[in-house]
């Protein structure tokens, strides 16, 4: 990765959180899946997502600024990447991984980073993985979202590694076996 030289590059890092949250919010309300049906208006997206129209406008403006959706003469449309990776049920969909694991499990932990670096957090505050797996609901959420996030990299690996002669496979990950499937 290139070394940063401009103030704007530092700002991009600082404000990336807002873009991520807009992405997670759009996934949460099914905006990309709604747009997979075809171009839409803010009014039709409001009906599709259950959000007030002015909030749809704000969300779509943020997503358009990042290139995740686009405004065309036909209306609001998904970008090719959103169609491929963020539409529920799409072949390469990993929206649940982003929405659930990154958005709901990992992002809240980022609020602890100052205390973690300073060493001022208690053991209970830093025991997230142990807590997740002791709670059946959180463990299921973690496993399902991790599976969704592993399917894409597994497909990428398969494109790069010829396994046509393989007779056995040892999965040492201990998860849902997304790479094996």
Regions found by a protein language model. Give the residues of each.
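Conserved SAM-binding loop of SAM-dependent methyltransferases across substrates and taxa
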Residues: 176-181
């Amino acid at each position: 990765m290139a070394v940063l030289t401009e103030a704007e590059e530092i700002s991009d890092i600082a404000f990336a959180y807002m873009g991520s949250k807009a992405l997670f919010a759009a996934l949460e309300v099914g905006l990309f899946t709604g747009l997979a049906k075809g171009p839409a208006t803010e009014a039709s997206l409001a009906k599709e997502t259950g959000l007030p129209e002015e909030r749809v406008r704000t969300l779509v403006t943020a997503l358009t600024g990042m290139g995740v959706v686009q405004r065309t003469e036909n209306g609001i449309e998904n970008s090719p990447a959103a169609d491929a990776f963020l539409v529920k049920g799409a072949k390469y969909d990993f929206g649940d991984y982003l929405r659930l694991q990154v958005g709901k499990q990992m992002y809240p932990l980022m609020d602890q980073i100052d205390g973690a670096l300073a060493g001022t957090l208690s053991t209970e505050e830093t025991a997230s993985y142990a807590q997740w797996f002791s709670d059946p609901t959180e463990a299921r959420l973690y496993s399902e979202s991790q599976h969704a996030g592993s399917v894409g990299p597994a497909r990428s690996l398969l494109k790069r590694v010829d396994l046509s002669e393989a007779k056995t496979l040892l999965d040492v990950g201990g998860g849902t076996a997304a790479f094996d499937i």
